[in-house]
Amino acid sequence: MWTGLGPAVTLALVLVVAWATELKPTAPPIFTGRPFVVAWDVPTQDCGPRHKMPLDPKDMKAFDVQASPNEGFVNQNITIFYRDRLGMYPHFNSVGRSVHGGVPQNGSLWVHLEMLKGHVEHYIRTQEPAGLAVIDWEDWRPVWVRNWQDKDVYRRLSRHLVAIRHPDWPPERVAKEAQYEFEFAARQFMLETLRFVKAFRPRHLWGFYLFPDCYNHDYVQNWETYTGRCPDVEVSRNDQLAWLWAESTALFPSVYLEETLASSTHGRNFVSFRVQEALRVADVHHANHALPVYVFTRPTYSRGLTGLSEMDLISTIGESAALGAAGVILWGDAGFTTSNETCRRLKDYLTRSLVPYVVNVSWAAQYCSWAQCHGHGRCVRRDPNAHTFLHLSASSFRLVPSHAPDEPRLRPEGELSWADRNHLQMHFRCQCYLGWGGEQCQWDRRRAAGGASGAWAGSHLTGLLAVAVLAFT
């Protein structure tokens, strides 16, 4: 009898371990319901009427969301609140003049909160539909030590304000008090802002642009030894912001590539570790779920209009998809649409390179979700540092023109082969959406919620043990 139960117990233990190592569930996708969203947030609406070079509308349908960061656009699926669009954000302007108190402890949180309703209502005018809301406050950072270089003005003024009140204090005491006052006020400004806007527009996912960051820009000084890894001290500092992650409902890191990193493994490592850090933060600071991560990138290299190479499309969009991000937001400013020539270059790049890659990755992520996760989760690379991507297999699929007017210019034709499914099984696992569980997101936790969640989990494990016993006795 006991020898017969040996393999059953072994199998049951394997199943229990697999259950225990399940990824935390995350928010289901918004917009189109796809597991990986690609959004276009570039003010290209000017290319047609102003420069007589409109982008191909069928190319633009490849994106799940289209928006513009320009001032005149409201009620969009993606809304970016720059510093002058949300309340009274204390900061110093480009000429060094104090605005709204300069430093957070010198600003009026009460007046700031009083103004939020009108500003949010102006840009997001209705509760529905759900969308992304990104607060872009970049002038100071809530962790004192991170206010280096041109941001040191916030530390200097903070020390000055304390020294005025306590002229007899030694510099060390002044600095310590200044840090406390700055960090406390910064925290209050960010926390209370999030709490207010979440209550006012609860269907939107809210977070701060560039949070978290991992400060892995040392490729300029250390090209030969650069790994892309986030310094341990910066990972620790991100954990000091647990209060921010707990209040956020989405994370919005940035992976803009400098041309220095073009078509290099350094570029891929730079992106990969930034996204991995965002996913780590998204996972560890919530007990029962992981926050969705939407990665900001650009269709071009930073500070220019040169389109990303194929390798760098893979290193940015492809890497984000394979690691398990909820999506990418392709952002650009008015520099993309200053003339007929800039619009033409962008239009050609979209048709030639960007749109075919976006269609490929979007559909590959969708097929993986269907095949691996029953459509109730997204595929996540088992080994974050592996060189495996969510790409349609060239032996099973091809992109063909779509002639339907309401569809993107390209669509995939083909189906997953046995080899494709085996590859996905080997290299990717599922992160289920909230309400679903199991290795392949096959268990409807909402249906099982008639009993306590603990009782449901227990009955599930009991079932696994029973199956194992039946199989080996």
UniProtKB/Swiss-Prot annotation:
The keyword Disulfide bond applies. Disulfide bonds join C47-C343, C214-C230, C368-C379, C373-C430, C432-C441. Keywords: Cell membrane, Disulfide bond, EGF-like domain, Glycoprotein, Glycosidase, GPI-anchor, Hydrolase, Lipoprotein, Membrane, Receptor, Signal. Residues 452-473 form a propeptide. Coiled coil: none annotated. One of its GO terms (molecular function) is receptor signaling protein tyrosine kinase inhibitor activity. SUPFAM superfamilies: (Trans)glycosidases (SSF51445). It is an enzyme of class 3 (hydrolase). The active site is at E138. GO terms for biological process: carbohydrate metabolic process; cartilage development; cellular response to fibroblast growth factor stimulus; cellular response to interleukin-1; cellular response to transforming growth factor beta stimulus; cellular response to UV-B; glycosaminoglycan catabolic process; hyaluronan catabolic process. Its EC number is 3.2.1.35. A lipid is attached at G451 (GPI-anchor amidated glycine). InterPro entries: Aldolase_TIM, Glycoside_hydrolase_SF, Hyaluronidase. Glycans are attached at N77, N106, N340, N360. It is found in: Cell membrane. Residues 1-20 form the signal peptide. Its main location: membrane. GO terms for cellular component: apical plasma membrane; cytoplasmic vesicle; cytosol; endocytic vesicle; lysosome; membrane raft; microvillus; perinuclear region of cytoplasm. Interacts with MST1R. Catalyzes hyaluronan degradation into small fragments that are endocytosed and degraded in lysosomes by HYAL1 and exoglycosidases. Essential for the breakdown of extracellular matrix hyaluronan. This is Hyaluronidase-2.
